[in-house]
């Protein structure tokens, strides 16, 4: 039976199909930051639970980081408490943290791809609605709430109901000064802010193929503004060229196997 990219990734990560039509899905990468993780770690402490797979976690200070005068530290008291909590929790559970003084620190949905933590075929979650950004690299990525952050920390799984498939094909050449941001705003205007509700959207077509990875990330990032849970795009040569030699990319054999799985053959 033919499968979409969404179908492929979902089926490969499905541990169990439940009687209520939900499924237990394995999560490959968990991105955490200071805003939605403190309560999740508190939940682990209360329930005396440990973390299932520390290596799957990428932790960074993100939402409360000042854009100027960083040498003065965090001045907002609430923001400071959240960042201190992230530091303490990462230290307690031996999770590597990309803190303010680390050159790898940055916006979570930017450094994931830049470091090669975001990889094709992965399931990726984060306590942030715009996690769909990572779908530009052929991953199934979506935001989760704090209770689910705790659940992934403890079990590496989530109980989910599968979305419906939604393909948006875009062809033609973008005019000068028209960007991917304009394109996704046009799409949202066309289908409405709830037009993608209950769907995962896959973007295809020559226009998408001609976009840079960064431009693709913009489209996937804003997919949730159309009400969809996630947006994703197929793996191609641009994806390969963007990811090659990234620090956390897996060994060549593993990656080559993934490429065969994800690549499309056009006849």
Spans of model-derived segments:
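Long, structured ligand/cofactor-binding scaffold of large enzymes
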Residues: 33-35, 39-148
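Conserved small/polar residues in nucleotide/adenosyl-binding loops
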Residues: 129, 265-267
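Mobile "lid/hinge" segments at catalytic clefts and subdomain interfaces of large enzymes
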Residues: 130-131, 135-244, 249
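Structural motif
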Residues: 23-24, 55-58, 94-98, 122-124, ...
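N-terminal amphipathic, basic-rich helices that act as targeting or association modules
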Residues: 1-54, 213-215
